[in-house]
A protein has these predicted regions:
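Short connector loops at helix/strand junctions that flank enzyme active sites
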Residues: 2, 33, 60, 76-81
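Conserved Nudix-box catalytic region and its N-terminal flanking loop in Nudix hydrolases
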Residues: 16-54
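A short coil-to-beta-strand element that immediately follows conserved catalytic motifs
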Residues: 59-69
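Conserved N-terminal beta-strand and adjoining loop/helix that marks the start
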Residues: 1-17
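Short hydrophobic alpha-helix segments
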Residues: 21, 69-71
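Active-site-adjacent beta-strand/loop module that shapes the phosphate/pyrophosphate-binding cleft
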Residues: 13, 71-96, 102-109, 117-133
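Structured-RNA-binding interfaces characteristic of tRNA pseudouridine synthases
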Residues: 114
Length: 134
């Protein structure tokens, strides 16, 4: 089963989340969390930090990630998606080659599937973050 990760990154004041606009399928043109594939034999948390750095230039010195939850999909292309969350410890200039990066207000409707990828999962993730006061 392929392992993937997505990472919810708050800015230092936790009023914005780092989102990318997908440039390719799946979800081309929609907003999504940053993340990617866990390589075979790779430690899961290390994979999250690696993907975060590759896609945003954020390092482990800038943020402490917490493993929040997992989604497991058993049908079709079975995969496990690990969800991490963290707040930047300082302002960081983000940039990446894979997708356009945008700071979105956390009061956005992340369940809006015309704007956000993941069939409502981004909204669900944020609700779990709020319940757990992360």
């Amino acid at each position: 089963m392929q392992g993937l990760n997505v990472i919810w990154v708050f800015n230092p004041t936790a009023d914005k989340v780092l989102i990318c606009r997908r440039l390719k399928e799946p979800y081309k043109g929609l907003y999504n969390l940053v993340g990617g594939k866990i390589e075979p034999g790779e430690d899961n948390l290390s994979a999250a930090y690696r993907e975060l750095y590759e896609e945003t230039n954020i390092t482990s010195n800038d943020i402490k990630l917490v493993h929040l939850m997992d989604f497991t999909y058993f049908l079709a292309d079975s995969c496990r998606v690990e969800v991490y969350v963290g707040t930047l410890t300082r302002k960081v200039r983000v940039h990446g080659d894979e997708n356009e990066l945008i700071w979105h207000d956390v009061n956005e409707n992340f369940f809006d599937m015309t704007k956000f990828a993941g069939e409502g999962n981004i909204g669900h993730i944020y609700e779990i973050i709020k319940i757990n006061k992360i």
